[in-house]
């Protein structure tokens, strides 16, 4: 793979991204779709997939931090971009001039943002967060919270674009708590409307709610993990969306050696050969996002067969046992995440080994790993981050 700076890469199929987004569009109808591209689009590369998302159903984007928004604006993305998290007030001018929509959950912050905007002769675009039960950020949906939001809505330098909350259990089979959260948001919005405040974009549905709870769609929805082809949990109704993972993580064999019986592999001597063995070294390790927790537990796909990761995963390398596979040589392609010939080892499988979720697996793929983008099975772009 000589178009990369190293023999480790992630392939992202833009056709699959497009199809996933079309599936979401078909499910939610004419509702606004806010495609969440934070954390480098969950490891898929925000700069290089944003246009595909927007061309196939998304009307807006959401990120977590201002540098993610700036990156998209600098790349020529003109669609509305929302920041879901905190932005220090010293970035106010940047927010306002680039028309980046900031989440607000503090009155004093909103006042400062309004003052900055007035000095620039503009308005700061904001979304107001309501904490209906996530316990993270947002105004509480009580009388005090209502008065604070009414005060923000009266500020001369802000334009309130949206009102939103975040569901904490929408991907679970029991939807009771999600319905409680939704009821709190809708009641809060009604109280605002009773006070003459009509916010144009109400949004609450995340991936789990998009799949299972169409009654929570409101004016728009926020899709994250489902855009990339993974379900938020095993408890959602998968039949509602036909998704396919868009990312495959690959490498090439860097070295092949034969070891006699009773020889050790990697740090700590945790693996000892039980017979004469053929061991292949792969040039990927935990600095690339291939976790040390996979040591002795993960599988890879090589030459249409599974091979086990043996010994401890190192910072930049790991080893696999290929004794049972014929003619393995330097340069052979290896799939670390993905599928081939009916064999599959994906982010769900890796997450189960590590005791985490598929989201984290995808986000762990580091900037040391180049991204290769394909359309119609042809490479259309390569992104080497470093």
Swiss-Prot record:
Gene Ontology CC terms, in alphabetical order: cytosol
Positions where N6-(pyridoxal phosphate)lysine occurs in the chain: 38
Enzyme active site: 38, 267
EC number: 5.1.1.1
Enzyme class of the recorded protein, top EC level: isomerase
Sequence positions that bind substrate: 136, 315
Coiled-coil annotated residue ranges, if any: none
GO biological process: D-alanine biosynthetic process; peptidoglycan biosynthetic process
Entries under SMART domains matching the protein: Ala_racemase_C
Keyword field contains Isomerase: yes
A Pfam family annotated for this UniProt entry: Ala_racemase_C
Keywords, comma-separated and alphabetical: Isomerase, Pyridoxal phosphate
Gene3D superfamilies with a match to the protein in the record: Alanine racemase, Lyase, Ornithine Decarboxylase, Chain A, domain 1
Pathway the protein takes part in: Amino-acid biosynthesis; D-alanine biosynthesis; D-alanine from L-alanine: step 1/1
Protein family (similarity comment): Belongs to the alanine racemase family.
Described purpose of this protein according to its UniProt entry: Catalyzes the interconversion of L-alanine and D-alanine. May also act on other amino acids.
Protein name: Alanine racemase
Species for this entry: Clostridium perfringens (strain 13 / Type A)
């Amino acid at each position: 793979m000589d178009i990369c700076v190293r023999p480790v890469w992630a392939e992202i199929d833009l056709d699959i991204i497009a199809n996933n987004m079309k599936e979401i569009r078909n499910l939610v109808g004419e509702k606004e779709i806010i495609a969440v591209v934070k954390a480098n689009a969950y490891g898929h590369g925000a700069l290089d997939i944003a246009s595909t998302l927007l061309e196939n159903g998304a009307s807006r984007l959401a990120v977590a931090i201002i540098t993610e928004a700036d990156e998209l604006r600098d790349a020529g993305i003109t669609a509305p971009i929302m920041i879901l998290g905190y932005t220090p007030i010293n970035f106010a001018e940047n927010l306002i001039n680039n028309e980046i929509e900031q989440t607000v959950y503090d009155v004093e912050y909103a006042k400062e943002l309004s003052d900055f905007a007035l000095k620039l002769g503009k308005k700061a675009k904001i979304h107001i967060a309501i904490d209906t039960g996530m316990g993270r950020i947002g105004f509480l949906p009580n009388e005090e919270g209502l008065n604070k939001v009414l005060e923000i809505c009266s500020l001369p330098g802000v334009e309130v674009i949206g009102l939103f909350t975040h569901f904490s259990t929408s991907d679970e089979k029991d939807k009771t708590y999600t319905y409680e959260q939704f009821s709190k948001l809708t009641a809060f919005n009604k109280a605002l409307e009773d006070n003459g405040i009509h916010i144009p974009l109400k949004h609450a549905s995340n991936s789990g709610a998009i799949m299972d709870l169409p009654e929570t769609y409101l004016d728009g929805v926020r899709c994250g993990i489902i855009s990339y082809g993974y379900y938020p949990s095993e408890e959602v109704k998968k039949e509602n969306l036909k998704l396919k993972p868009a990312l495959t993580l690959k490498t090439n064999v860097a070295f092949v050696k034969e070891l006699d019986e009773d020889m050790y592999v990697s740090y700590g001597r945790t693996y000892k050969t039980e017979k004469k063995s053929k061991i292949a070294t792969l040039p990927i390790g935990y600095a690339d996002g291939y976790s040390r927790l996979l040591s002795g537990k993960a599988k890879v796909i090589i030459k249409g067969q599974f091979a086990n990761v043996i010994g401890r995963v190192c910072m930049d390398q790991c080893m696999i046992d290929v004794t049972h596979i014929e003619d393995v040589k330097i340069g052979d392609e290896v799939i670390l995440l993905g599928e081939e010939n009916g064999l599959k080892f994906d982010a769900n499988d890796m997450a189960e080994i590590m005791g985490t979720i598929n989201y984290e697996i995808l986000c762990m793929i580091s900037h040391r790993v180049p991204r290769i983008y394909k359309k119609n099975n042809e490479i259309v772009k390569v992104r080497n981050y470093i």
